[in-house]
Curated annotation (Swiss-Prot):
The keyword NAD does not apply. It holds the Pfam family Ribosomal_S13. SUPFAM superfamilies: S13-like H2TH domain. This is Small ribosomal subunit protein uS13. The gene is rpsM. It comes from the Bacteria. The lineage of its organism: Bacteria, Bacillati, Bacillota, Bacilli, Lactobacillales. Belongs to the universal ribosomal protein uS13 family. Residues 93-121 are annotated as: Disordered. GO terms for molecular function: rRNA binding; structural constituent of ribosome; tRNA binding.
Length: 121
């Protein structure tokens, strides 16, 4: 099993799909990484040679992925909250940040609906 950026890639999947298991690498970034490393997208993870793994590892190390990226995102959110911006306020209140309506929807962000006691007839 290939281990890249601290993540075990699934052996039976193609490399381009396996790379997307790393936080911060999507489909297009995985394709760029493989073209830069000179590895075919159709190769399965189990069929990678040690040399190909090292090339992919070297290219992935140039990107900010996994823990570093998670830390950066959380620090960005913390910074927005500390400076008192509107976006920071929305993050603190666990509401949608990008202007969505909250009258009817936004259940994912707000959590399960809480019933109001004493509303019975």
């Amino acid at each position: 099993m290939a281990r890249i950026a601290g993540v075990d890639l699934p052996r039976n999947k193609r490399v381009v799909i396996g790379l997307t298991y790393i936080y911060g690498i999507g489909n297009s970034t995985a394709q760029k990484i493989l073209s830069e490393a000179g590895v075919s997208e159709d190769v399965r993870v189990r069929d990678l040679t040690a040399d190909q793994e090292d090339k992919i590892r070297a290219v992935v190390d140039k990107y900010k992925v996994e823990g570093d990226l998670r830390r950066e995102v959380s620090l960005n959110i913390k910074r927005l909250s500390e400076i008192g911006s509107y976006r920071g306020l929305r993050h603190r209140r666990h509401l949608p940040v990008r202007g969505q309506n909250t009258k009817n929807n936004a259940r994912t962000r707000k959590g399960p609906a809480v019933s109001i006691a004493g509303k019975k007839k």
